[in-house]
């Protein structure tokens, strides 16, 4: 399927896309890599992106896949937190002329967290400040992607209630964020401020941005999504505690 999408796009005249469970990018990887190498702007819609819909068990739950796809040069892995960010990701994908895009989507329902004109949404820059500290300068920055942005927002509320100003950054795309100016990147991830990442996947590459990482460094488990996430530590309370442990 992914190879066919690449062939249709390379032929010209049609913008093709294909979709499957995100876990099955294991079978798609060679064709995704060839699309990236050939600067072919294919679009892939990959769903069931975490243990958040957990009844199928670990065979169908991606954990290493976000890192594996981000590791391929010239691939835009875009994992939105809500419908507004998804629309922004589609816009970026359709405007791309030399880069394949993976839209990595949840299957479970998510709240709408972001605001902004879809014609110019800050998610198009790869990462942006979704929630600023309530008062004063942030002492900690919580970086979330996809369905875990809501976890970061809830953890922020816990920290603020404890007197710790916290910022939430939504980072749907490392690829797009790295293309921004140094000034913009520093305005989002302020130097000197402790950072915690939260993503329902392996934490291997997150030290690039974060001082501490909340993730899943093991295979998943078969359980309702909410229970699976709790068992694996993807909870607001755990994220807030990890942030507190970073601070003097």
Put a short name on every predicted segment:
Residues 9-10, 35-38, 44, 68-71, ...:
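Solvent-exposed alpha-helices and their adjacent loops that cap or buttress functional pockets
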């Amino acid at each position: 399927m992914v190879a066919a999408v690449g062939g249709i796009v390379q032929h010209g005249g049609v913008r093709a896309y294909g979709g499957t469970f995100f876990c099955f990018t294991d079978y798609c990887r060679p064709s995704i890599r060839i699309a990236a190498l050939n600067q072919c702007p294919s679009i892939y819609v990959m769903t069931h992106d975490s243990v958040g819909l957990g009844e199928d068990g670990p065979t169908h739950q991606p954990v290493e896949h976000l890192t594996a796809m981000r590791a391929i040069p010239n691939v835009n892995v875009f994992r939105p937190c809500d419908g507004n960010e998804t629309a922004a990701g589609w816009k970026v994908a359709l405007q791309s002329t030399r880069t394949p895009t993976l839209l990595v989507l949840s299957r479970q329902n998510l709240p709408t967290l972001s605001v902004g004109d879809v014609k110019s949404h800050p998610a198009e820059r790869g990462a942006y400040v979704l929630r600023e500290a309530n008062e004063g300068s942030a002492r900690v920055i919580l970086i979330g992607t996809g369905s875990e942005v809501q976890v970061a927002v809830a953890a922020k509320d816990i920290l603020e209630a404890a007197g710790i100003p916290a910022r939430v950054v939504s980072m749907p795309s490392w690829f797009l964020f790295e293309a921004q100016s140094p000034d913009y990147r520093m305005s989002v991830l302020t130097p000197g401020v402790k950072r915690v990442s939260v993503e329902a996947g392996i934490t291997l590459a997150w030290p690039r941005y974060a001082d501490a990482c909340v993730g899943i460094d093991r295979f998943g488990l078969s359980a309702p999504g909410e229970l699976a996430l709790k068992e694996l530590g993807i909870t607001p309370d755990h994220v807030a505690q990890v942030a507190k442990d970073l601070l003097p």
